Amino acid sequence: MKLSPSAGGVSDQPPSPPEVAEEQKCLNSELWHACAGPLVSLPAVGSRVVYFPQGHSEQVAASTNKEMESQIPNYPNLPPQLICQLHNVTMHADAETDEVYAQMTLQPLSPQELKDPFLPAELGTASKQPTNYFCKTLTASDTSTHGGFSVPRRAAEKVFPPLDFTQQPPAQELMAKDLHGNEWKFRHIFRGQPKRHLLTTGWSVFVSAKRLVAGDSVLFIWNDSNQLLLGIRRANRPQTVMPSSVLSSDSMHIGLLAAAAHAASTNSRFTIFYNPRASPSEFVIPLAKYVKAVYHTRISVGMRFRMLFETEESSVRRYMGTITGISDLDPVRWMNSHWRSVKVGWDESTAGERQPRVSLWEIEPLTTFPMYPSPFPLRLKRPWPTGLPSLYGGKEDDLASSLMWLRDSQNTGFQSLNFGGLGMSPWMQPRLDSSLLGLQPDMYQTIAAAAALQNTTKQVSPAMLQFQQPQNIVGRSSLLSSQILQQAQPQFQQMYHQNINGNSIQGHSQPEYLQQPLQHCQSFNEQKPQLQPQQQQQESHQQQPQHQQMQQQKHLSNFQTVPNALSVFSQLSSTPQSTPSTLQTVSPFSQQHNFPDTNISCLSPSNVSSMHDTLRSFPSEAASDLPGVPRITPVPVSDPWSSKRVAVESTITSRPHDISSQIENFDLTPSSIPQNSTLAPLPGRECLVDQDGSSDPQNHFLFGVNIDSQSLLMQDGIPSLHNENSSSTIPYSTSNFLSPSQDDYPLSQTLTTPGCLDESGYVPCSDNADQVKRPHATFVKVYKSGTVGRLLDITRFSSYHELRSEVGRLFGLEGQLEDPLRSGWQLVFVDREDDVLLVGDDPWQEFVNSVSCIKILSPQEVQQMGKPGIELFSTSARRLGNSCDNYMSRQESRSLSTGIASVGSVEF
């Protein structure tokens, strides 16, 4: 069925192709948009839109002057908002009335398409509004048969071709085309007392043919092709009697609801008609516009806003109002709908013509902090570790509620949408890092990597390189990685030939204990058969230059599956008879090379306990020969949101001949080096590294391993293996790793006995970290324009919330700094590297260790701030050498008042 366009019906079948082709041929897009109105913008073909059946019903009610009856059946399967793909848009104009309308072909998205990530690049294609035009509402004299059309002087000089004033009277012939391509001729003359521009001959014919009356509007457009276009807008006059050819109002309501419900259940296409002049509001809007308004704007009762309205002269004007309520327009039939969910009150006395309810995407709140798009050039300097408290020191629920206004909590369809590209913060998407749940495996791998360091050549063992993910090494690190592998290749071959005889002797006894079931990583082993072909294919390409040598090692195929670094435990045992039992317990972990960021199946708490059992079975005699590994050193990473990679600052004992003899027994063949191994991250604030890769000149680290010749040997052998004052548990607050229950994980008793390493060298607790980063309490200067700066002991606080509360109390801004998204007040700080960052971007301890001074930005400074202001702010701090007492001189304050930028939402 095809309904009257004026009624905005729904059709399952589009009009016939000849009819569409004929209308498209005669239609001018610029003229159509001019007749539709300055606020009308059709979505782009191929984009995703949100269709509101509730708004479609309003168009039918406005066209038929009859609201939807209560006896109309309800469609429970039809959601209040339907996300669709826009396949086609066709602009039409009624042949008799010149009423413009658009025909859209929509197709609801499938559940799978709703889950796919969608990154809208625009908020809809802006309609091509004419720039050189004028619009006039006809008066009674303009529509009289004996008169003419009076054109305002300024409009005639702007749109019409210039008159020849040498003639008396000046006159010319004008030819204009309407929407259907019909040409209309008028005589343009400049006469009268006072003189004015008139359209005389041909005007009365045009008025009679179009049946124009007083109140209708006429548009004249001079386009880029030097053509004069003519359009009309009829005044909204509800029809008192509907023609018999048009379906009843109830039938139209039922038809559009049934068509939409059928399309939603079958994911089939359906066609709608949109009449911009008859519809109170747009009911098909771009998805990006909907997401911006609903998920990126926070409103509340009492908030001021402004809204655009069309004027009589086809221009726009902003009207001010106040939000008086937030609720569903029809909670019975359309529950959790965003259509006209905001009750408003208008300021002006003419507000009777305005709607008492509006939609979120129609208004512009005045007190909401700008969040989308963000003009602020700051980014996160350091990666935010998974599981840490959220931005403003509260719970993640508080952060989510401050960043978006989500009313359709019952609508699972919108919860499944991925709007990460629209400004949503990455920590709003909860992620469980499996490697953060298990702490002890990092220690084992750290010990093994340190022991595999070759002392004689000052090169990093490939057993250490296997723990570094190749694609996570940036810039110089990737280049150095390839150079080291090339330099170490001849050494691998030489060591392989030296040890092939010894390995062949051990090869007969190894399968006896290598065939034990892998009970502790069953979830990984279930995936291993799919991973083996890829690993074998990679190894085949790497082993082609050494094909002949590899033929001699066929009897060691079972032993090649054990990673080199983890097999160090068996080689470092002082008693040969303990090797089988040790390797038997280590082998289950040797199959687990990769630690994905979001997979928690391998390193569950049960596996952590099994690792404790493994370490308990490790003999103390073997542990006594292990070299000591001092504190962890960060490794630069490329992805700011990837897991923190453990960097091993390893040193070797003062017995080089013992280590050399042990290294000779290692199987360092390239075939035994996994190429896709990833070292699990060790949580802690010291693992957060600067993305610029800056480091101390005295630190000589390659992939996190100290290659300084002076630090390769430890002077006094292994350090103290036990600290009596250390706790046997890792507190959640100090370790900063993710725990769903926020409980403390007990350390293995083996680690706290005198026979093994002290955990203080691996777990960066608050005590030893503060000794390194901040040896004494630090007072930070806090600045605010127009007031005297205050000194603040930053170490007194434990969260951003406490800091914001205290700063607000000191400067009389109580409640303003805790909610910057609403108040507009922002805190920025200068770190010790002269970078300007938002307070709250970094984890709390990183902020404490790096803050140099803090600046309070007023809403005016926030709005004025831009990239030049950021550069000026940073340059001033660098010139003054981080001396916060002299940081804000009067002259610089005067410059910053015009240059300090707006701190919109931080983009990631």
From Swiss-Prot:
<dbReference type="InterPro" id="IPR053793">
    <property type="entry name" value="PB1-like"/>
</dbReference>
<comment type="subunit">
    <text>Homodimers and heterodimers.</text>
</comment>
<keyword id="KW-0804">Transcription</keyword>
<dbReference type="InterPro" id="IPR033389">
    <property type="entry name" value="AUX/IAA_dom"/>
</dbReference>
<feature type="region of interest" description="Disordered">
    <location>
        <begin position="525"/>
        <end position="556"/>
    </location>
</feature>
<keyword id="KW-0238">DNA-binding</keyword>
<dbReference type="GO" id="GO:0006355">
    <property type="term" value="P:regulation of DNA-templated transcription"/>
</dbReference>
<feature type="region of interest" description="Disordered">
    <location>
        <begin position="1"/>
        <end position="21"/>
    </location>
</feature>
<dbReference type="GO" id="GO:0005634">
    <property type="term" value="C:nucleus"/>
</dbReference>
<dbReference type="InterPro" id="IPR044835">
    <property type="entry name" value="ARF_plant"/>
</dbReference>
<feature type="DNA-binding region" description="TF-B3">
    <location>
        <begin position="134"/>
        <end position="236"/>
    </location>
</feature>
<dbReference type="InterPro" id="IPR015300">
    <property type="entry name" value="DNA-bd_pseudobarrel_sf"/>
</dbReference>
<dbReference type="Pfam" id="PF02309">
    <property type="entry name" value="AUX_IAA"/>
</dbReference>
<dbReference type="InterPro" id="IPR003340">
    <property type="entry name" value="B3_DNA-bd"/>
</dbReference>
<keyword id="KW-0805">Transcription regulation</keyword>
<dbReference type="Pfam" id="PF06507">
    <property type="entry name" value="ARF_AD"/>
</dbReference>
<feature type="domain" description="PB1">
    <location>
        <begin position="777"/>
        <end position="861"/>
    </location>
</feature>
<protein>
    <recommendedName>
        <fullName>Auxin response factor 6</fullName>
    </recommendedName>
</protein>
<dbReference type="GO" id="GO:0003677">
    <property type="term" value="F:DNA binding"/>
</dbReference>
<keyword id="KW-0927">Auxin signaling pathway</keyword>
<keyword id="KW-0539">Nucleus</keyword>
<comment type="function">
    <text>Auxin response factors (ARFs) are transcriptional factors that bind specifically to the DNA sequence 5'-TGTCTC-3' found in the auxin-responsive promoter elements (AuxREs).</text>
</comment>
<feature type="compositionally biased region" description="Low complexity">
    <location>
        <begin position="526"/>
        <end position="556"/>
    </location>
</feature>
<dbReference type="InterPro" id="IPR010525">
    <property type="entry name" value="ARF_dom"/>
</dbReference>
<dbReference type="GO" id="GO:0009734">
    <property type="term" value="P:auxin-activated signaling pathway"/>
</dbReference>
<dbReference type="Pfam" id="PF02362">
    <property type="entry name" value="B3"/>
</dbReference>
<comment type="similarity">
    <text>Belongs to the ARF family.</text>
</comment>
